[in-house]
């Protein structure tokens, strides 16, 4: 909102503190209508979402500011976490008036209210909040030998050729069963820990590693057992220990909303010798699933019959996953993991997530719990329920899909103002601890490869074409230039930079399974990797990039710039996402200025820095 404005929640003249408020904290609101409007009264109109209560607080006259009259009030945030929606009401002595909401003055209709998040303060583990995450799809990262899948759950087979495409064509029944494996292993990951450390990695987030019939392993067969194609529990303990020696923690993927139909729990095909819920109503797991009636009709995740949905409220299931002394969450943390990422957090009840958080922190004092949420997690509605993910007792933070969406929109031709607005909305809505612990990324196992997205115009229409698609030299050159910009934003923006395996060496691919190819050992784009490693090193070195706040300096057209500062250190990021030269000027009251990426030095003139950025060029100034 540009000057002059009546109320802007991001302006300290109108609201302090910025953004979310801690339970019980005092929040100061000030409105500044033009005196010529004739308003003599102003009220703050609140609605507390979880309490279901409304409140109207009259603001007191607070003098004049030029041609504006000021109204102010100090509001004490509730003692319990809450989501508050608010707008203002103005009226004159003659009784006439109007409301003020995010769109401006209005005299009718439902106000489009501002949001105030009220949260209970909690601490994010420092190893995560100031680190860099590397996401691995375990089957596709590194294999040391070709394993034999004979005798394992599921009709699995292993590619002999590491460089082949994953299978994507449906079988004769029209199903893509994901039974083709490449043989990546935990020992393979261990063998590359030094290279990951050189990249700046401080945490490994691994897609599921427990026994499963599918290569993605999101249909768990046995939570107590490492999938034999990956290794065993001793390999896992060794991975965690050796990673920690290099300053790297391990984050596991918790898939607790559903299991696999081929699992020790459901056992639809009778592979396991014990009785599963699909075989007998006397199974110890029978109350984990909902049948309509037993055994052929049952609840499944999104109706996919190979993914029977779990009843999270089944007492024995809660004890097995969370509450028990040797629960799944606790036992794998004791085995060496440092945290969990909850798959499909929207599908899990809030009380379940709260219990999981408690178990994580009981098992490991600096344990981490993050969640897969694709939208703004502060006000998410899932299955008609407003969620409380970030209010202090559930998740430490979430995967920041809004960051990826907004950044890619900007890099692919959108206005920089949209990137800024999307990120400022998240900063305003999230508790600061959660905002600065956002898992920021350019791609995951659920998105197309970042280089492909940036280099190509549109995806080919047919899956056949997408399977064989490769960027042309011209497309790859443009995509690489934009990838460098995207990586610069990733490593310099508040949050935890997260790299999906292979993005740092120029892997390509559209949607699943083409985004889950094997790591191209010996064929890496080393120039891209060196650039990522440089950025990872700079983040480790510079306090401002790990802890600094953010202030936007420019966000217009194809140019974005922001500054982060901490303990007297400043880092300025400037991004030109356009295909032509851009100029940028800023105050720089210091003697010298260096682009920390290229080493190029700039000399301020009369305290002003005048920069020329070429097409698709970015700078990190310090």
What is the predicted function of each stretch?
Residues 1-137, 141-143, 149-153, 159-163, ...:
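Carbohydrate-interacting/catalytic domains
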Residues 137-202, 209-335, 356-362, 379:
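Substrate-binding/active-site clefts of carbohydrate-active enzymes
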Residues 240-249, 257-258, 263-274, 328-330, ...:
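Active-site-proximal helices and loops of the catalytic beta/alpha 8
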Residues 139, 383-384, 436-471, 487-526:
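Aromatic/acidic polysaccharide-binding cleft in carbohydrate-active enzymes
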Residues 207, 226, 343, 348, ...:
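Conserved residues at the C-terminal ends of beta-strands
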Residues 420, 424, 460-481:
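Aromatic-anchored helix/helix-loop segment that forms the rim or "lid"
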Residues 132-134, 204-206, 250-252, 340, ...:
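Hydrophobic faces of well-ordered beta-strands that scaffold small-molecule active sites
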Residues 139-142, 210-212, 256-257, 333, ...:
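Short, solvent-exposed loop/turn segments at secondary-structure junctions
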